[in-house]
Amino acid sequence: MIARIIGEIGIEGARFIEENIDEQFKALRYLSKGIDSETFVKLVIANSLVSYQLTGKGEQWWWEFAKYFYGRDVKSIYLAYKEFLPNSRFNRRLIPQKLSRIRRVETFLSTLTEERIEEYYGDMSSLWGSIARALGVDKESKTVVFSVKMFGYAARIVLSTFNPYPMEIPIPEDSRIVKLTKKLTNEKPRKFWMKIARESGVPPLHIDSILWPLLGGASIDSAPPELRDKLAELIKIIR
């Protein structure tokens, strides 16, 4: 049932949700207008890697991030976060651990020229491996796969081009997804949603884009009628 509905929504439906319903994408679009492209993409990756154990909703955190960095001159991403996180409203836990992550990934981020960003956007699986190696963590770690998703958003905004996510990158095991998975199955989230991805033809990161805003209570009123009907059907299952 859920694979059928997600298949009917499809990648183009997921794209509509990402660009018009997901507050994270809206926050990034806002920030992109107030900072240079390279710094924008670097910040988005860095922010993704510290987006855990939040003290508010993910939507609130990404808007706080976007408003904080809009128009700001960022010389060092590590130093910027050393100032930002302790004063953050929605991300105040485990600050030393999060700053350590930023420090570990900063050398990799410094390699992201506009040309390199475009190359990685054409091969997001390669980016996935590069971020995991820079951090020294498992590729399937929640924040690593999430950082690829958010890089995809940022690169799409900067390059004005849509590239679908690779099928092999798993869904981020965020609390909303974990809770929903328990409601639907006894399988592990990553395994279950990879199976749904293969059945529906919609890559796991796009499935995440469909589910995550809806689980957060996002309105579907802006969707075209046909897509809105499918989303309403999906909401009955997941909420």
UniProtKB/Swiss-Prot annotation:
User: Which Pfam families would you find in this protein's record?
Assistant: AGOG
Q: Which reaction does it catalyse?
A: 2'-deoxyribonucleotide-(2'-deoxyribose 5'-phosphate)-2'-deoxyribonucleotide-DNA = a 3'-end 2'-deoxyribonucleotide-(2,3-dehydro-2,3-deoxyribose 5'-phosphate)-DNA + a 5'-end 5'-phospho-2'-deoxyribonucleoside-DNA + H(+)
Q: Which InterPro entries match?
A: AGOG, AGOG-like, DNA_glycosylase
List, in alphabetical order, the Gene Ontology terms for molecular function in this entry. class I DNA-(apurinic or apyrimidinic site) endonuclease activity; oxidized base lesion DNA N-glycosylase activity
Species in which this protein is naturally found: Pyrococcus abyssi (strain GE5 / Orsay)
In which domain of life is the source organism classified? Archaea
What the entry lists under Gene3D superfamilies is as follows: Hypothetical protein, domain 2
Name-wise, this protein is N-glycosylase/DNA lyase
Stretches the record annotates as Helix-hairpin-helix: 118-182
Respond yes or no to whether keyword Nucleotide-binding is given for this record: no
